[in-house]
């Protein structure tokens, strides 16, 4: 048996309570420094990152079906199915359920919904085809809550069309001002904000991502920075005070990701990273869970928006949203993000090594071939 297993793990992220908000005034009006996604790492957990990359690279020439067979044999827990009376469309629904349950998010949301007569609105960003929305409606019913949902996703992209059985009277697709549903365009996020301006937006969920070719899979984190930031900014603009946010992340080694996490600890009352059971131990996926939106100072929001419009000029280069000098001295945050990143990476390496050993053993290879 492998030394690790698929199970839900929670990591708190905090900043030093004695510290003040990071001062972005010195960044106003300045041109954004950028770095290519291949060069977007520093020395943070460099040894752990190298070990993880090596463990992934070991499978470059492995047959995909053989890898999947060995993985599923060793880690059978991350499978789809029924939770209680709720059946989810796919594993994404299980991931969201486990993530929300792990931090008591439904109990928090029910408190706010009670004051709003049992109703609240969620927004599903980059959500097509709607696994998260479907799961939220199902779980909301279990918790005796009435939900209204709005969703933004790319239009006319195979596999991203909204599920036809999402409740038509309670779920409202949005494709932005230009009709594309492209979250990379700030005006489409603004359109979604206008559409929900009178709604009690208590929850934003964001599960966006895309397939990364095998030859650059080690750079999944930095290749995904633009879509991660777009979803993160969407929540900052959409949420009402006290609202919550669930965002899919990958590795958290780069200065960009750490800067976003640090800023997040100042924007919400409670921040945690959850690795749910259905998010396989051998992959880099994890979920950022933010509870109790405090709000962003006007200067911050202006800086965030300018970073999105002027900093992300293409998909290859990543702007500096916050210099490391503004968060590297926070020892509490540094310890939390290091523990989270190192633990998930270590578990991932152990799981990948177990799969490799199974593939290299003669009985396992014969079993896979049969």
UniProtKB/Swiss-Prot annotation:
Effect of residue 207 to A: 96% reduction of activity
pH dependence (UniProt free text): Optimum pH is 9.5.
Predominant subcellular localization, coarse grouping: nucleus
EC top class named in words: transferase
InterPro entries per UniProt: mRNA_Cap_2O-Ribose_MeTrfase (IPR050851), RNA_MeTrfase_FtsJ_dom (IPR002877), RrmJ-type_MeTrfase (IPR025816), SAM-dependent_MTases_sf (IPR029063)
Gene Ontology MF term list: mRNA (nucleoside-2'-O-)-methyltransferase activity; rRNA methyltransferase activity
Active site per database record: 248
Consequence of changing residue 95 to A: 98% reduction of activity
Superkingdom to which the source organism belongs: Eukaryota
Binding site residues for S-adenosyl-L-methionine: 130, 207
GO biological process: 7-methylguanosine mRNA capping; mRNA modification; RNA methylation
Catalytic activity: a 5'-end (N(7)-methyl 5'-triphosphoguanosine)-ribonucleoside in mRNA + S-adenosyl-L-methionine = a 5'-end (N(7)-methyl 5'-triphosphoguanosine)-(2'-O-methyl-ribonucleoside) in mRNA + S-adenosyl-L-homocysteine + H(+)
Gene Ontology CC: one annotated term: nucleus
Entry EC no(s): 2.1.1.57
Keywords: Methyltransferase, mRNA capping, mRNA processing, Nucleus, S-adenosyl-L-methionine, Transferase
Domain RrmJ-type SAM-dependent 2'-O-MTase: 87-294
Places the protein is found: Nucleus
Keyword NAD tagged: no
Signal peptide coordinates: none
Record's subunit section: Component of a complex composed of CBF5, GAR1, NHP2, MTR1, NOP10 and Tb11.01.8210.
Role this protein plays: S-adenosyl-L-methionine-dependent methyltransferase that mediates RNA cap1 2'-O-ribose methylation to the 5'-cap structure of spliced leader and U1 small nuclear RNAs. Methylates the ribose of the first nucleotide of a m(7)GpppG-capped RNA to produce m(7)GpppNmp (cap1). Cap1 modification is linked to higher levels of translation. Recognizes a guanosine cap on RNA independent of its N(7) methylation status.
Protein name: Cap-specific mRNA (nucleoside-2'-O-)-methyltransferase 1
Gene: MTR1
